[in-house]
A protein has these predicted regions:
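Conserved nucleotide-sugar phosphate-binding/catalytic loop shared by glycosyltransferases and other
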Residues: 3-6, 13, 31-81, 253
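A short, glycine/small-residue-rich beta-strand->loop->alpha-helix junction that serves as a flexible
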Residues: 11-23, 215-217
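Short amphipathic alpha-helix
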Residues: 19-29, 44
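Donor-nucleotide binding loops and adjacent catalytic segments primarily
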Residues: 26, 169, 184-272
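Conserved nucleotide-sugar donor-binding subdomain of glycosyltransferases
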Residues: 73-116
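A nucleotide-sugar donor-handling region in carbohydrate enzymes
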Residues: 126, 131-137, 142-214, 239-242
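A donor-sugar binding/catalytic signature common to diverse glycosyltransferases
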Residues: 262-305
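C-terminal amphipathic helix plus adjacent low-complexity
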Residues: 329-360
């Protein structure tokens, strides 16, 4: 369907989630005969290059976002907002300069509004059609919709039925005319006949830490302190792809990063999973059919909203970072039984068929 078409896949570089959720998309492009080119930098590029070592790549730098140590991110984000706008303009100019050299037929951008061109089919993948922001939300939502309209297509990573996983973020009264749902995107798949099914879980707790500093490290320190007082073996995945050495602190194994299949097995072979309430993580949990203790990043509007949403749906246990209690969470079960959801559904195949039509 896409035989020989050179398609750039460019994830946003705020943490690793945007890169990891591009993995199943890249796999599907390869299956359809396309030639994906990876467009990323630093951690996201390290993740994608590890998953696809033979693929061509190009470095596309982005802005480094830092969160405040306090729970109030308003002033921190406001100070960085002008740099974010400049970054969008810079990456647009950079992309136009490299487009011809890369001999691209199309581009798929994960939340990078500057990675598009009027000269070739440009697709945006997102779950943030109607984003939550700490200030001027109605104005910024209009700006977001205007940016979405500049792409030929907008693929929404969520279930069609509201509230889905993203709730109001992806289900509004009126969706953009160029949008369609493609289901969840996750590099995870259910592990059949895992050791935990017959002999008990290998790990009591598997914690997957992610996101910008300093909040990533703050959560790491809280979890490590509490885990040392809980019997059993625990695993902490630090969300640091450049950290190659495995470390052991008492009953806790610490590793910088794990590829999808290994992480899926570890998560499936645990009594409890702990993670942020980032959207990519929620898609991974849905693909595995696992609940988790989710901890929103303090002051991160979207994660706090998703925490509130799923405290109500009963899919997950939700605790705030300043009141994490792992012992209590271990004794709690989520209200709603979960069934693994298939990632890379027929909806994605239909969207790729539409892309093939644009390329004719």
């Amino acid at each position: 369907m896409l035989n020989g078409k050179r398609i750039l896949v460019a994830p946003l570089d705020w943490g690793l989630g945007h890169a990891t959720r591009c993995v199943p998309l890249i796999e599907r492009l390869l299956r359809f005969g396309a030639i994906p080119i990876l467009g990323a930098d630093k951690g996201p590029l390290a993740v994608l290059s590890a998953e696809f070592p033979s693929l061509e790549y190009v470095r596309i730098p982005g802005i480094t976002v830092r969160y405040s140590e306090s729970g109030n991110q308003l002033w921190s984000m406001a100070k960085q907002f002008p740099a974010m706008l400049r970054s969008m303009q810079t990456e647009r100019a950079l992309f136009e300069g490299m487009r011809a050299k890369l001999r691209l037929d199309a581009v798929i951008s994960d939340q990078r509004f500057g990675i598009r061109s009027n000269a070739l089919p440009s697709l945006l993948i997102t779950h943030q059609v109607f984003p939550f922001t700490p200030f001027a939300q109605s104005v910024l939502r209009k700006v977001n919709l205007r940016n979405i309209a500049r792409f030929d297509r907008c693929w929404i990573m969520d279930e069609q039925r509201s509230p889905g996983l993203a709730g109001e973020l992806s289900h509004g009264a009126e969706l953009p005319g160029n949008s369609r749902y493609i289901g969840i995107l996750s590099r995870m798949a259910p592990i059949r006949n895992s050791p935990s099914e017959s002999t008990g879980a290998k790990y009591r707790i598997v914690a997957v830490i992610s996101g910008p500093e300093p909040q990533r490290s703050l959560l790491e320190n809280i979890l490590l302190e509490q885990m040392q007082g809980i019997k059993g073996e625990h695993l902490v995945v630090l969300g640091l792809p450049d950290e190659l050495d495995q470390k052991q602190i008492k009953n806790i194994t610490m590793i910088g990063h794990m590829q999808g299949s290994k992480l899926a097995r570890a998560m499936s072979d645990s009594e409890m999973i702990v993670s942020r309430s980032g959207y990519t993580t929620l898609m991974d949990l849905a693909a595995l059919g696992r609940s988790a203790l989710i901890v929103p990043t303090p002051g991160q509007e979207e994660q706090e909203y998703l925490g509130r949403l799923h405290a109500g749906t009963g899919r997950y246990i939700v605790q705030q970072q300043n009141s994490i209690d792992l012992t209590t969470a271990l004794g709690t079960t989520a209200d709603q039984p979960l069934t693994p959801q298939h990632s890379g559904s027929d909806l994605l195949d239909e969207a790729l068929g539409d892309l093939a039509g644009l390329l004719q």
